[in-house]
UniProtKB/Swiss-Prot annotation:
The active site is at H24 (proton donor), D69, Y119. One of its GO terms (molecular function) is L-fucose mutarotase activity. It catalyses: alpha-L-fucose = beta-L-fucose. Substrate binds at D32, M79, Y119, Y137, N139. It comes from Bos taurus. The keyword Cell division does not apply. This is Fucose mutarotase. One of its GO terms (biological process) is fucose metabolic process. Mainly homodimer, but also exists as homotetramer, homooctamer, and homodecamer. The homodimeric form seems catalytically inactive. PANTHER family: FUCOSE MUTAROTASE. Keywords: Isomerase. Involved in the interconversion between alpha- and beta-L-fucoses. L-Fucose (6-deoxy-L-galactose) exists as alpha-L-fucose (29.5%) and beta-L-fucose (70.5%), the beta-form is metabolized through the salvage pathway. GDP-L-fucose formed either by the de novo or salvage pathways is transported into the endoplasmic reticulum, where it serves as a substrate for N- and O-glycosylations by fucosyltransferases. Fucosylated structures expressed on cell surfaces or secreted in biological fluids are believed to play a critical role in cell-cell adhesion and recognition processes.
């Protein structure tokens, strides 16, 4: 836990350090409990543990500090349902939460990345945050944007 003015207390020092080191276009994965975080991070992105935290609450905290990329169509991406889950009508209410949180922060939200494409993209991410999110298809990739000089302290 971090106890600093203006910094959400649920953001760990490791996560804050990763967010600070990311550059424009770098991506971070907020991963649910079923995501193969350790496997994806073997030889690739940094793995950051955030066990016990849900992705919606973590997303709200991260967006207080991390600007998302406004130069791309969607700086936030989820994994599409696999055909069998789509056919069975599996619901993904967590996506509605993401959409609401991102919209309040002024960002667009995109669906449309297949499972294996998502895994390959995650391997190229700056970091993967392994959370306690239990919602199916809860994984979310965020692309860092830029801060204008007037927004820098």
């Amino acid at each position: 836990m971090v106890v600093l003015k203006g910094v959400p207390a649920l953001l760990s020092p490791e996560l804050l350090f990763a967010l600070a080191r990311m550059g424009h276009g770098d991506e971070i994965v907020l991963a649910d409990v079923n995501f193969p975080s350790s496997s994806i991070c073997r030889g690739g992105p940094e793995e950051i543990r955030a066990d016990g935290l849900g992705i919606p609450q973590l997303l709200e905290a991260v967006l207080q500090l991390l600007p998302l990329d406004t130069y791309v169509q969607s700086p936030a991406m989820v994994m599409e349902l696999v055909p069998s889950d789509r056919k069975s009508g599996l619901l993904t209410p967590v996506w509605t939460s993401y959409q609401s949180i991102l919209s309040r922060a002024g960002y667009e939200f995109s669906l449309g990345m297949g499972r294996f494409a998502f895994y390959e993209r995650a391997k190229k991410a700056f970091a993967v945050v392994a959370t306690g999110e239990t919602a199916l298809y809860g994984n979310l990739i965020l692309k860092k944007g830029v801060l204008a000089p007037k927004d820098l302290c």
